[in-house]
C-alpha cells in the first residue's frame, strides 16, 4: 500500500509534463517547415554548366545558346538573289573600239610571266591582254608560274584551251603561242616590272619606250599590275577575256562537270564553301583562335620562315575584319542565314589547321559534307592530283556552278568567283562581314539564338552578292565588274507595273528595302574593305618597294633568298 502511495506523485508529474513536451515538439516542426518554405532554391552557380556537344542528330547546345537544326524562317529566297532577273552581263566592244588588225604594230611583242596560284595567275592573264592592247603589241601566250611555292609544271595549254583563247580574242588583240625567230635565233626580251595598279598612261610612259627600243619586253611577276579604273572599252575587254576567252581544257571541264553532276544527284541545291584555313594562312594573318600556347608556338614557328613578316596585333586584326572565319563560325553564319542541317555543302580547301577537330563543329551543323576527294575516286583524280593548278581548277568549276558560294576569307579565288557570278546572273555569293561578325561570335554564349541570327542577317546585308550591292568602281574590278553589268530597265518597269496592278506595290517595296542594301546606305564602318589590299598584295609590295616611283628592270639575282615566296604560298 505504501508502495503505491510513493509512485502516485511520480505519475502525476509525468502526466503534467507530457502535453508540454508534445507542444514544444510540434512548435519546432512547424518552425522548421516554415523556414524550409521561405528558403531560396539552389542557385545556378551550384549547377554544373551543360557541356557543349556537337551532334548531327540533336541541336547543338551551349549555355543559353541553342542552335536549331532547321534554317528557320527567312524573309528571302535563300537560293537566289532578289531582282537578279533584271541584270545581265554586257561586254561587247563599242563601235569606237578598232579591230586588232588596224592597231597592232608588227614590231612590238609583249611577254607576260604570271605569279602565284591559279586564280592570281588568272588576273594576270586577263590584264596581260589589256596591257597588250594599250601598247598595240602582239601578246605571246602568258607564261604560268612554275617556280614558286606551288611548283606546278603546268603551262597555259594544260589549264586553258589555248586555241579558243587566241581565236576568241583575235578581233581585240593579236596573240601568238611563242615569239618568232629573229635571224634564226630566239628573240631576246628585255625583262622588267611595272608598278601595282599601273594605268594606261603608266604603260605608255614606262613600258612603251623600252618596247620601241627592244621590240620585245617581258613583264615579270605580273599580278594586279593594271589599274582598276580604265576606259569602258578596256574594262569590257577585261570581261571578254575573263568570262568568255578563258575556258578550261576538256579534261578539266569533263571532270569538273562530273563533280557538279554528283552533287546535284545528292540534292537539288548545294552550297560551295571556299575554306582558307591553312596553317600558313593563319600564321600570316597574325590572328589568334583560342588554341593557347600550342597554337602560339606552332604559328610563330611558321612566321619565323619569313624575315620580312612583322607580328600583328591579333585584336586589331579581328577588329579590321582581316581574320579568316573559323569553320565553326562559317557554319553558324550559314545557319543564321537560313540554311538548315539538310543542306549539302561542297568544301574546297587545302590543309585545315587543326584537322578534323577544327572541322567537327561545321560537320555537326552540316553533316552532308563533301569535297572532290569524297565524291570522286583516286583513279579519277589521278590525272590532276599531282598538279595544284589543275586541282584548283576542279574546285573552281564546282564553286562556280553552286547555287550559293561562300568564302571565309576574301582571297583571289573568292574575288574572281564573286565577279564572275555577278556577271553571269548574280547567283548568291556570301562574303562575311567580318568587322561586325567577330564581336557577335565572341559574345554568342551571352545571347539567345534568335537575337544572334537576327544580327547576323542584319550584318550580312550588302555582303550577299545581290545586284547594285557595291557602288560602281569600288574595289578590284575582277570582283566588281560594274562596267560589264547592264540593267534591263524595261523588264523591271513592266514587273513593277504588274505588281501595282496586283495591289502588291507596298509589300514589294517593303521587302526590297529589308533585303537589298547598297553601300551608299552603309556607314564607312560597315563598308567592306574593297579598297584595301589583301594579304597577297601587301606581301608582294614588300618585294616591290620603290616600284611606285619608277619601273625597274628585272634581273636574276643570285643573292636572292631561297625561302618560299609568301605571296605565292598564300595566293589561290
Curated annotation (Swiss-Prot):
Q: Where are the transmembrane segments?
A: 17-37
The enzyme's main class, written as a single word, is transferase
Q: How does it sit in the membrane?
A: Single-pass type II membrane protein
Q: Which pathway is this protein engaged in?
A: Glycan metabolism
**Glycosylation site residues:** 92, 136, 446, 506, 549
Entry GO terms, CC: endosome; Golgi apparatus; Golgi cis cisterna; membrane; trans-Golgi network
Query: What are the boundaries of the region Disordered?
Result: 498-572
Please report which protein family the annotation says this sequence is part of. Belongs to the glycosyltransferase GT106 family.
Q: What name does this protein carry? A: O-fucosyltransferase 16
Gene that produces this protein:
OFUT16
